[in-house]
Amino acid sequence: MKTTFLDFEQPIAELEAKIEELRFVQDDSAVDISEEISRLAGKSQQLTKDIYANLTPWQVAQIARHPQRPYTLDYVREIFTDFHELHGDRTFADDLSIIGGLARFNGQACMVIGHQKGRDTKERAMRNFGMPKPEGYRKAKRLMELADKFGLPIFTFVDTPGAFPGIDAEERGQSEAIGHNLYVMAGLKVPLIATIIGEGGSGGALAIAVGDVVQMLQFATYAVISPEGCASILWKTAEKAPEAAEALGLTAHRLKALGLIDKIVSEPLGGAHRDYKGMAAMLKRSLAESLRQFQGMSVKELQARRYERLLAYGKFKETGTQD
């Protein structure tokens, strides 16, 4: 699959195009230009390192939305075995913007739940662009309760612009569905490990992300509103999105510093979309480490730990005195 380059990656795109051109010439020529190709490849790699070492929050937001970025089902295929998808909320419908089902993680039975976007126009419409309606969140709740009943750890994968804001979703109780999920997750008797893999958009993300461990991929985002939405409210124009992204503090490193997430999972050079298998391998190791800490922990200990964790959000902390 040919890589799609973002606007700020155009210098890299130009180098990669030159490399491809030289490779094509080498195939049809007796002249050996492999050294020049290697030199340009090294230059491209260094340029990628330099650009990705100095990303702005707005650029990170663009990477989190990259159309080739791995989605939940991509990770399910690489990380889990024996995945069996479960459908429907048993109340209204089956929302395909959230997928979930039984699987095995390193041989252990578990429940997997996540947002799912689409790759092409037809699939994006089918998945509602990764924006769940109430039936999607109620499906997730049903699967969480099923996992709780059978003592299965839960892995959730967050990647949504936000909950669907349509009239039909509001009529069917969007806020109630999200709120009920928060209530259920807070009281689970099994560990829940949440990973923000792309966009973490407001309550639509939080509805499957009240975890005992919350981790983010290096170039994922997590915020109460999109940069464009914030800019439209504060400055009446979406053109101020870069400034809004800075103010929102939506990057993994910023959120880790604030204590809102627990771990950051490094991504391959150039982002997760450059190396699906490499990204999945790193994420699998991180998930295994997170799950291991709950081995032998009683339900009482697990819930007490979660209770303390949730109460710690938003605590005011004195850092010094002023004269």
UniProtKB/Swiss-Prot annotation:
Q: Where in the cell is it found?
A: Cytoplasm
List, for all copies, the residue spans of the domain called CoA carboxyltransferase C-terminal. Answer: 39-293
Q: Which UniProt keywords apply?
A: ATP-binding, Cytoplasm, Fatty acid biosynthesis, Fatty acid metabolism, Lipid biosynthesis, Lipid metabolism, Nucleotide-binding, Transferase
What chemistry does it catalyse, as a reaction equation?
N(6)-carboxybiotinyl-L-lysyl-[protein] + acetyl-CoA = N(6)-biotinyl-L-lysyl-[protein] + malonyl-CoA
PROSITE patterns reported for this sequence: COA_CT_CTER
Q: What broad class describes the main subcellular location of this protein?
A: cytoplasm
| Keyword Cytoplasm set for record | yes
Q: Which domain of life is it from?
A: Bacteria
Pfam families named in the record? ACCA
Give the pathway listed in the UniProt entry for this protein: Lipid metabolism; malonyl-CoA biosynthesis; malonyl-CoA from acetyl-CoA: step 1/1
Subunit organization: Acetyl-CoA carboxylase is a heterohexamer composed of biotin carboxyl carrier protein (AccB), biotin carboxylase (AccC) and two subunits each of ACCase subunit alpha (AccA) and ACCase subunit beta (AccD).
Q: Return the protein name.
A: Acetyl-coenzyme A carboxylase carboxyl transferase subunit alpha
What species is given as this protein's source? Cupriavidus necator (strain ATCC 17699 / DSM 428 / KCTC 22496 / NCIMB 10442 / H16 / Stanier 337) (Ralstonia eutropha)
